[in-house]
Amino acid sequence: MKGLEEVTMTEILNIENLHVSVDETEILKGIDLKINSGEVHVIMGSNGSGKSTLMNAIMANPVYKVTEGDIFYKGENINDWTTDKRARAGIFMSFQTPDAIPGVKLGDFLRQAKEQVSGERPSILKFNKELKKEMDSLKLDEGYADRYVNVGFSGGERKKSEILQLKTLNPTLAMLDETDSGLDVDAVRIVSKGIQDYISDDNAVIIITHHRELLENIKADYVHILKDGKILHTGDDSLMDKIEEKGYEWV
């Protein structure tokens, strides 16, 4: 919601004719997608349609080979950028199954990540105060900051941990891959509220989901339906109603 005042929108991401292959098998077959600041884009599609492949290609996962087309971030072609460079530039991706990092405390991990992204070393006292506030909003006990990243975390705790990373790092482009997967109703609401708190006129969000519950507090500006590596339909959030009613067979 932009309010009554006109907001100047900035192009965050522009994908042109993107083809992506995995092990020489073409998964994406000509994707065009433009995302501006302040926008929330939802990507839906049956399993194997190419949703996660798209996010991994944007994040420069080396398993996913861009064979044709271009990815522009803030007007700059990033085809040759490494994953690390994209992350430092403000591109964030959550995962369906977040990895555990034994030996690295969550609080230390977030403080170091924030330093790398911002280029500034945050005050420990100020950082810890802000971290506690964000953890409280996600109903995570502050003791989690001293636990190793995702080690022994339940599925719900791992997803909340990723939203904590999102809110702490405050990236320009957030890509959330089935963040609601495996969560109970209460956890979905907490995660949904966390995403809503992050959204602003200065950033943009791509959400992959099969369920509308995650979007309970989030207004989707565009919904895209993928099938066989192509975007076949783009519309408003009424497309989600159609999917819930008819499934993907009509696509």
Language-model regions: role of each:
Residues D70-R86, N150:
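ABC ATPase NBD Q-loop/coupling interface
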Residues T25-L28, K85, R189:
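Short coil-to-beta microelement around the adenine-binding A-loop and adjacent beta1/P-loop entry
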Residues L13-I15, L28-G30, I35:
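Conserved structural motif at the start of ABC-family nucleotide-binding domains
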Residues E178-T179, D186:
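Walker B catalytic motif
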Residues M44-S46:
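The feature captures the beta-strand-to-loop junction immediately N-terminal to the Walker
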Residues Y222, L226, K230-V251:
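Conserved beta-strand-loop-alpha-helix hinge in the C-terminal portion
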Residues M59:
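Helix-to-loop junction immediately C-terminal to a conserved catalytic motif
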Residues D99-T172:
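ABC-family P-loop ATPase nucleotide-binding domains
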